[in-house]
Regions:
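Conserved catalytic core of the tyrosine transesterase superfamily
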Residues: 2-44, 67-278, 282-297
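Short amphipathic alpha-helical interaction/hinge segments
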Residues: 58-61, 108
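Hotspots on structured nucleic-acid-binding interfaces, especially in canonical RNA/DNA-binding domains
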Residues: 39-57
């Protein structure tokens, strides 16, 4: 297969001469005709997972693909047992196995999970021993935001920006990507809302609005007045001397502010960029807002 798809060299294979031309032809067809039709996320996942599998096979001198289903089953069982020894969750392991099966299927080589019911049951039993979900982010509830507002020193620009970040995040229930993408023209002060042009849950592509409280409006207004920002990104990078930059904050900088918040408030949990979103949802539930309305947020 093309180097575009495989980044691991000298991987053991056990493909019979009679199968080799078909396998090469199928993989070439995948590269030339099908690969670019897939979404970037799908391509990235398949490529990452399969190259990880190939690396495992190389390190353990096991044939990655074989004409003999029993050879493939031995390799795949060893790989499954390896994945089970890691900290990967249920769905991550299933995805990695699915990626291996995808390339076996493309090659039209025997799939041990299809050929052996016992191996399929073994795999399901093993994977089901793993937690099926990642632990949910600890919610930053409304009372924590109130504590933030009481404790944050908003005289320095970094403290004022923190207040804008956390209040906007819990009000709008925006994801980190939406927060970082806020521009001044997205903010409607009169109607107390912020427009997000893109959303993970917005299938229509029309964008969505997030509500902002009077407290948040006042903080944003103070931030704009102090910084002189008139257009462009709302949440800007700050230099070491707290000079406002033209560029928007990056994700790693946003995450660092959440970590700093834990130290400031002596929180017993480690907040993440998802904590304000979870906290906002919890608050909405407690205030009687319907599940349908929350799902649209």
């Amino acid at each position: 297969m093309s180097a575009m798809l495989i980044h691991v060299e000298n991987v053991p294979m056990a493909i019979a001469e009679s199968d080799r031309d078909r396998v090469i032809g199928n993989l070439r067809e995948l590269k030339d005709d099908v690969w670019e039709l897939k979404s970037e996320n799908t391509k990235r996942a398949y490529q990452y997972d399969f190259n990880q599998y190939l690396g495992f096979c190389k390190d353990n001198a096991l044939p990655a693909m074989a004409s003999d289903v029993n050879v493939t089953k031995t390799t795949c069982r060893a790989y499954l047992d390896y994945l089970m020894s890691t900290k990967l969750k249920h769905h991550s392991i299933r995805r990695k196995i699915a990626s291996v099966r995808y390339f076996i299927g493309v090659s039209e080589l025997p799939d041990p999970w299809k050929q052996s019911k016992l191996f399929a049951e073994y795999t399901n039993h093993k994977i089901n021993q793993k937690p099926s979900r990642q632990s949910q982010a600890a919610p930053m509830r409304l009372e924590i935001i109130d504590a933030i507002n009481a404790k944050l020193d908003t005289d320095p620009l970094i403290g004022l920006r923190d207040a804008v970040i956390f209040n906007t995040a819990i009000d709008t229930i925006f994801r980190a990507s939406n927060l970082l993408a806020i521009e001044i023209h997205h903010i409607d002060f009169a109607k107390q809302r912020i427009f997000a042009p893109r959303s993970k849950t917005d299938k229509s592509g029309k964008g969505q609005y997030g509500y902002i409280s009077t407290t948040t409006i006042n903080l944003i207004d103070k931030w704009l007045t102090r910084t002189g920002i008139a257009d462009g990104p709302l949440l800007r990078k700050l230099s070491p001397k707290q000079t406002v930059q033209d560029n928007a904050m990056q994700y790693h900088a946003l995450l660092a502010r959440y970590k700093n918040l834990a130290a400031t408030l002596n929180l017993e949990f480690k907040p993440s960029c998802h904590s304000t979103r979870v906290g906002g949802v919890v608050t909405m539930f407690e205030r009687g807002i319907s599940l349908d309305q929350i799902q649209k947020a």
